[in-house]
């Protein structure tokens, strides 16, 4: 009951406090003597975009890749968990994780990379909290602004600027599909690393 939940939750971070903070370090811009921008060094964080700013096929492409049932579960998807278990048993190893988009956001925002039962339960508890606090569209918006998409780019705006030199609001269907294809392995599939492989994933 409550005691079991308390045991799992006692050392969890305060999600409201974490979301209110922004500890992301901006890229450093190297400029020439005449003031012209030469290059950026470090991670790139784009301007925050709202869901309404984006063409609909961008979030659609992401959900088709990451969480097709996003709008039909409360943060944790029992059907996805069962499907992952069956797939892993058939494969004889871990092939699918069963985590929803909300769980991925909870893990990326609040938790360490530690892979234990305790962390998995905390991930689920935080996913339920996010769903209750923000709702689907806001969760998707936060995810789109925070997700790592390779080449030091965090968020769809930064990724669009890094790879295509345009804003996320100007993304076309192919570019949206290419960004969605980066989610599985951002560094491996980044267009800056292997353009053909990235296009094949789109």
Where are these regions (language model features)?
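N-terminal post-signal-peptidase region of extra-cytosolic proteins
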Residues: 13-17, 42-51, 64-65, 124-125
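Conserved SET/PR-domain catalytic core that frames the SAM/AdoMet-binding pocket
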Residues: 32-36, 55, 59-60, 131, ...
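Short extracytoplasmic
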Residues: 21-53
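Alpha-to-beta junction loops
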Residues: 35, 67-68, 145
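Acidic/histidine-rich, surface-exposed loop or edge segments in extracytoplasmic proteins
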Residues: 38-47, 63, 87, 184-187
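Non-catalytic, structured segments within soluble enzyme domains
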Residues: 93-202
